[in-house]
Amino acid sequence: MNIMLLGAPGSGKGTLAEKLIKNQGFNQMSTGDLMRKEINDETPLGIECARYMNEGRLVPDEVTMGIVKNFLQDNHNQLIFDGIPRTLNQAKILEENLIELNAKIDKVIYIDVPSEILLNRISGRLICPKCKVSYHIISRKPKLEGICDNDGTELVRRPDDAPEKVKVRLEAYANETAPLVDYYKNKPGFIHIVDNANTTAEEVYAEVLGAL
């Protein structure tokens, strides 16, 4: 079985993916990791990918999906697709690639969270720069305010998590992903999970397991 996760930053996709990997034997496909490997191996696609990145340009869909296709040749089962596809064009290319391999996306899980909740979740995040553990000023407070429980390091907020930048990220995500939700919602296996302020990660995970 292959699963795709759709949801805005702060929707809990990462937490859900971790639980599915740990408890259900899935593997997560990271486009970023795949690109870095192709670049390090200096493959033709990797060289082309590096050229676009070095020029500060977006990597075209044909390059990104070419790298994904190479990975799928030997890995096309028990996968979690998160962060790919990002566009409708990528979704169609991915579907074609999987058909060639006699594989498919079995379930598309869309975690739908109101924008005001996302804003509060993300802008309230604090990170330990040493151990990378994440905290939250409301829902996951450290024992000592502003200090990591593990190593006593002062917690920081990532620049991208500032409220004004979060709003920009959420707007960009909405514009980018709305067509994907529309594309998949009429296909078999689409799961729509509404996550409100009171929904826990365990409740989302339980609902997903019940639908798989």
Curated annotation (Swiss-Prot):
One of its GO terms (cellular component) is cytoplasm. It catalyses: AMP + ATP = 2 ADP. GO terms for molecular function: adenylate kinase activity; ATP binding; zinc ion binding. Pathway: Purine metabolism; AMP biosynthesis via salvage pathway; AMP from ADP: step 1/1. Zn(2+) binds at residues 128, 131, 148, 151. InterPro entries: Adenyl_kin_sub (IPR006259), Adenylat/UMP-CMP_kin (IPR000850), Adenylat_kinase_CS (IPR033690), Adenylate_kinase_lid-dom (IPR007862), ADK_active_lid_dom_sf (IPR036193), P-loop_NTPase (IPR027417). Keywords: ATP-binding, Cytoplasm, Kinase, Metal-binding, Nucleotide biosynthesis, Nucleotide-binding, Transferase, Zinc. It holds the Pfam family ADK. Gene3D superfamilies: P-loop containing nucleotide triphosphate hydrolases (3.40.50.300). AMP binds at residues 31, 36, 57-59, 90, 158, 169. Residues 30-59 are annotated as: NMP. Belongs to the adenylate kinase family. Consists of three domains, a large central CORE domain and two small peripheral domains, NMPbind and LID, which undergo movements during catalysis. The LID domain closes over the site of phosphoryl transfer upon ATP binding. Assembling and dissambling the active center during each catalytic cycle provides an effective means to prevent ATP hydrolysis. Some bacteria have evolved a zinc-coordinating structure that stabilizes the LID domain. This is Adenylate kinase.
